[in-house]
């Protein structure tokens, strides 16, 4: 698959500019013709979103805190945090037979949350089955550590997102590169951008039949959060993936074409990939 460069999760500016000019020309031609209520309907803001935020690093982890605080800046978002009580990295899609118990907790910034004594997927199940939550979208992360290539199948972050998708709810897993100073503000911003770009569609979400895939974002640690952009691509194949991931991304690289998420990530891009709901 040939990769696509995205700007804040959208097509490049030139493409958007062309579309905008066409829209303006069409709108000008229709001035005074549209029904009186059309302008009001077009300007109507989409309904607020209920966003279930979870992770695998635990409810008090800095990554989930960054995502929650970033999502809360938009007052249209109702952010509900349900996450494992402790670190469950590497849990994949494991779940507890009969479910796991939960109780009140807070994030690192003091936002009210529910801590579940189980796996990341258990936290999602608790939100649906015990709290009877009906979210528009599930956001899992930001994880401490990238989940590239085949590592999605052992990731609790991805496992939680997959559980949401099995419930028929669109889901995003977001992960930040390992390092002494993980750039959570960048991965949190990318999560917000992803939600915003899909806001109108997400507002119409009705849980039902299981979805077939989730989205996964992986962000490298670049100086001052200056990732080169978002590159939509496919996951790297299994053999040799771990050795191919660089510990320090080349954020000053000038390469622009990549075969998979590992190559783009190594060159300073955040990657956006589609991940099947069921593990390989």
Briefly describe each language-model feature range:
Residues 2-41:
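Secretory targeting and sorting signals
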Residues 46-47, 69-123, 134:
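A cross-family phosphate/adenosyl-ligand binding-site feature
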Residues 54-57, 82-87, 116-119, 140-144, ...:
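Active-site-proximal beta-strand/loop segments in catalytic clefts of secreted hydrolases
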Residues 62-66, 70, 119-126, 159, ...:
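Extracytoplasmic/secreted proteins, especially bacterial periplasmic and envelope-associated proteins
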Residues 153-159:
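Charged helix-capping and loop-helix junction motifs
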Residues 165-187:
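Glycine-rich phosphate/pyrophosphate-binding loops
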Residues 185-280:
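Electrostatically charged, flexible surface regions
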